[in-house]
Each structure stands twice: as C-alpha cells, then as structure tokens.
C-alpha cells in the first residue's frame, strides 16, 4: 500500500526525476484538504454500524430471497458473515479515503474477493447493491456541512464515491 505521497515519490524515483511542480501542487492540495478528509473519515467511521445495518436492511427488503430459507444470508451465521463483509469493505474504503489512494482497498480487500464470492455461491451483484447502498448513506453523512471544515468538498465527495464504485464493480 502506498499513500499519495509515497506513490508520487516512487514514480518520480523510478523515472529518475525530481518531483514536478504539478506533482508538488497536487500534494500541497492534498495536505490543505487533510482536515476535510479526516472529517469525512471520522463521520463515516462514527456511523459505520448504522451505515452497514441500514444498507443491509434495505438490500434484504429489495432482495428478500437472500434471507429466505436457502438464501445466501439465511441463518444467523450467514447473516453475520454478510454484515461482517460489508463492514470490512466500508472499513477499507475509509482507509482509501484517508490515504487518498485506492491501493489499500485493492490490495487488502478487493483482490480475489469476487472469486471468493463465486466459490461460495454468493451473488456478487447483491454484494454490489449493498456497497452502493453504503455509498449513498456514507455520502449523505459525509456531505452534511454541519460541524465540519468549511470549503468545497465536491472533489473529495467524488473521490469517496469512486472508492465505493470501485468496490461495487470489483464484486459484481
């Protein structure tokens, strides 16, 4: 896993070049937006149980066959595994938000996840719907302007959305 700083330095080093002005400007902007980034991570983390529970509740209301006898989330053990997986995906999304880089999400969460779900007979499309529901909830919570660092958060919210989209497409 490389954070945004290590990634830029590593790429410049591999090319045998100094950091460019545009790279330094991009990293400076990342530092300037650091408080907003921490606010977003804190909000999502502080509401993680609610985000996961509500996303699961909504998913099962839309796809009741998942919790019916024979469904992939039928029995308390399978339901717990489903909620655990949603929680893990959300946790790694917050790591990516904090780092400003999706590599931690890719390397430690998404790599091989689709194949695991296929092997278990878990419908990846249902997992993707659950991730999208977490995305909607997380964006609503993170985008609330009350009590957070002031400033334009449009690009940060787009970045947050992209991590959820990456997770959803990885399992679909």
Swiss-Prot record:
GO biological process: photosynthesis
Topology with respect to the bilayer: Peripheral membrane protein
InterPro entries documented for this protein: Globin-like_sf, Phycobilisome_asu/bsu, Phycobilisome_asu/bsu_sf, Phycocyanin_b
SUPFAM superfamilies: Globin-like
Cellular localisation: Cellular thylakoid membrane
PANTHER family: C-PHYCOCYANIN BETA SUBUNIT, PHYCOBILISOME 32.1 KDA LINKER POLYPEPTIDE, PHYCOCYANIN-ASSOCIATED, ROD 2-RELATED
Similarity-based family: Belongs to the phycobiliprotein family.
Protein name stated in the entry: C-phycocyanin-1 beta subunit
Lineage, top ranks: Bacteria, Bacillati, Cyanobacteriota, Cyanophyceae, Nostocales
Chain's gene name: cpcB1
